[in-house]
Amino acid sequence: MEVIKTNIPGVLIIEPRVFKDSRGYFFESFSQREFDDKVTPILGHSIHFVQDNESMSSYGVMRGLHYQRMPYTQSKLVRCVKGAVLDVAVDIRKGSPTFGQHVSCLLTGRDEEGMKIAEQFAKVSVQKRIW
């Protein structure tokens, strides 16, 4: 797994190690051990995911801006399994030096890339393509 920092602390791009051959491909979509080894040092604290959600949107549908208020905030690990989606994380943390700034990432079912979004960020996604 490769972890790529963005211009906003708390938002990371996650690229899994993918094994491809003539039969198809395989990769670990999540490993707590690897996440702890590679992401925790960057964030400065550990994260333990307790919920896994999946959604499907028709072409052009925009979902968001959504977020959770304290004490129910959630960190997110987002990826696209089919088609393409533009995912955007917006810093809405009051007093943050990056308040109001955003990071966008085009996630596709072809590259297995994901985006880690910190707590207290708003998120929006737009379905770009369905394969």
Short names for language-model regions:
Residues 1-111:
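Non-catalytic, conserved peripheral segments adjacent to functional cores
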Residues 107-131:
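Conserved metal-binding segment of the jelly-roll/cupin
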